Every structure is written in C-alpha cells, then in structure tokens.
C-alpha cells in the first residue's frame, strides 16, 4: 500500500512539471489507475480469500512493473526534450555572438587587485560551453583589448598576422581573452569634450601600453593635450599627446552630472505634453532633411573651404566647424548662403568702372577677368617663358673666347667653359625645386658647414699638440686640406642657394600690387 502511494505521489509531481498535452493525458490515465488500485486494495484488504491471494499478488506485481516502465519512459522523454531545448538555446547563442564578431564592446579583465572593464574588440566565439553564475548555459567570446594597460592585455602582433609560433600559453602577449557573453557590456567611446585640467586619462606610450596620467592643459584647435604621467619611472613625466592617443576616464563627478541631467531631463519631459514633443521632433527632422538635401544638391567646388589654411596659420574653417558649420552647405543657420569664398579682384589703376566693364565684356563676360589668382598665374607664366627664352639664348651664344678654346686650344683646355655649363645646369636645377625644399637644403648645408668647422678645429688642435711627430703632422695636414676643400664646396653651395632664394624674393616683390 505504501509503495503504491509513493508511486502516486511521483506521478502527481510529474504531472505538475509536464508541459506537453500528450504526456499530461498519459499521466492522468496512470493516476486514475493508481487511485482505483489503491481503492480496490483498501476495500478488499483482509477480506480476500486465501486462495486468491497469489493471483492478486501477481496482478499487483505486473501493475507495478508497468508503472515503473511508464515512469522511466517519461523520464527519458523529459531528458531528451531538455537536451533538445539546451541545444536550441546554445545554437541561438552562437548565432547571436557570431553576428557580434568585429564589434566593439567593454569586457572584464581580472587584475591582481580585482576585476575592471576595458574597451575591447570581439574577434571570435569559443567552442567550449560554460554555465554562468546564474546557472544558465552560455558561450565564451575571444576579445582583444583596444586600450591595454598591462602586458598580459597587449595583443600579439604576430598572432594578428597569423605568424605567431607560440601557442596561447607560451606566448608573452595576448592571443585574445576569453570572457562569457553575459559579462559583455556596451562600448564606451572616448569623449574628448570632457578633457580639462586635472582630468584623469590613459595615454598611449611607445611601449604600446596605456599609462595613467592627468591633464595639464588642452588645445582644442590643434587637438593636442599636455599630460603629466603618474609614477616615477617615466623620464619625461610631462608630454604632449594628440587626442587620438588619449582616453578620458570617467570620474564620480561625471556620474553625478549624468544622473542629475537624466533627472532634469525626465522632469522636463514629464512637464511637457506629448503634442509639443511630437511638434518639436517634426520640426527637427524637417530641418535635418533640408540640410542634408542642401549638402547633396549644392554646387561642390573643386577646392574645399579653407584649403589655403594649410599654407598659413589661419584657423577660420576650424572656428566655423566649432560654431556648427557643415561642409558642403552654404553659410548661415539655414545653409542657404554662399558656398565658395568671395574672390578678391584688382581693377586697372586709373580706369573708370565703365572702362573696366568694357574690358570684361571684351573678354566675353569673364567674371574672373580681374581676379588676383588669375593675374598671379598669368605673371608666373610670363616669367617662366622669359626664363626659358633667356636660358636658350645664353646657351646658344658663342663669344670669341669660347671659339678660341674650342678651335685653337682644343677640348682639353676648355675647363672654364665646362665649369660655366655645370654652374648653369646647377642653377637651372635649383630653379626646379620649391621654396620649401630650398629652405630645408639651406638648413642642412649650414649644419654640415658647422660640423666641418668643428672637425677642422679638432685637426688644428691635434697639429698643435703633436708638433714633434712628423708622420702624424703630414697625415693631419692632408686631413686639414681635405676638410678645407669640402668646406669651400659647401660654402659655394650655400651661396648658390642664397642667391636663388634672394632672386625668388625679388620676383615675389615684383608681383605684389
């Protein structure tokens, strides 16, 4: 009797956990059979004849065996259904995580002092299945940290290229950290607008690690920041870093400001009505669509606005960007102003406006007829043609001395002419270079002249110090003579460069109006 009651209790528990209708029907039928069997057993009890007891015992044993077989079948079906559910859940997780490969995230890293989250890049999904802290199946992701602060976080450059000869356990650098998918957080992009004095930041040093420091000053125009690095192991604690080499850290004050801003925003939203919000959203969307349309269909000039600033110290275009200007649109808040800057024009001196208009009409109404750029280009073309004609004229001119050197003395005695030709070729070669190249070459030659003068001073000191050694004196004098010849050559080159630079300056003065 007790065994039947225990079997009935097991069937009732299985009935509570069953989700399939077919299983519930089978369990209900089995429960009814057990209840009837228990009722029959209680009714007959001790009243059953002795000759029927063996037959009744055999029936009970058969019923018990059938009950056990049905329970085992139900347990097997439940376990198989659970396994199928787990496989389906794992396949969905792998599909979800595979789609995240290549995305940025924030992943945990266990340090000696605790766990901290760092920005990382998802590079793959591990085959191993794990159970997270909540007892749920989960997969592990392989991530590479984008702002490594310790050597074990630093990605292996050979592994990224597929050429690392060591496995993950033996390599000194990281082949990717394995983290569970449930521990991944949202990526925290750097907010450079938060850069201010005493702001804690991570700075990238030549060892490819990000070191902690504090901001001393910020230049938002040049996008350069001076940082004082923490620790005593840095020889130069104060360094200048570009914005892309910094990562501003979040402080408690930032979190409080975000919370207060969220609270104020929520209160303002609660106070305003839904109709006003929809109207503002419609206006903002219409304005953005209009600005995008203007930027797409507005005339695009060949040169971008502010292209000339790379040759000057101008910051006008950068200030316009700070004030909200969108490249490709016109000036003004609505973007309907001019796109190209106003070009300066120089009218003929002493002529009336009517005469200037007649000149423009004679040029088929060319609007750029009096532009400064056009006049400068025209003057440059004229000067270039004049230089070419002068060079051809000088190269073809033959005087009496050249005739005597060529005809009477022979080609072996015309060294002076060859030097002149070489000098002209050198001057023509200098004319082909830009002003910036000439300035760099002048600085280099000046450094070589100073170095050669120092070498000559050292040789002179050696001559004075070793006046008694004849052999050494002879070698030092040969070195001194060689240094003098090289110095004379460098000084001649310096004079040629200086002459060319002076010629260009005088030409520029001639072109100024």
UniProtKB/Swiss-Prot annotation:
Q: What is this protein called?
A: Zinc finger CCCH-type with G patch domain-containing protein
User: What are the entry keywords?
Assistant: DNA-binding, Metal-binding, Nucleus, Repressor, Transcription, Transcription regulation, Zinc, Zinc-finger
Q: Where are the zinc fingers (C3H1-type)?
A: 155-178
Q: What is its main location?
A: nucleus
Which GO-annotated molecular functions does the record name?
DNA-binding transcription repressor activity, RNA polymerase II-specific; RNA polymerase II cis-regulatory region sequence-specific DNA binding; zinc ion binding
Q: Where is the composition biased (Basic and acidic residues)?
A: 496-513
Domain of life, per the record?
Eukaryota
On whether Repressor is a keyword of this UniProt record, the answer is yes
Keyword Methyltransferase tagged: no
Its annotated function is as follows: Transcription repressor.
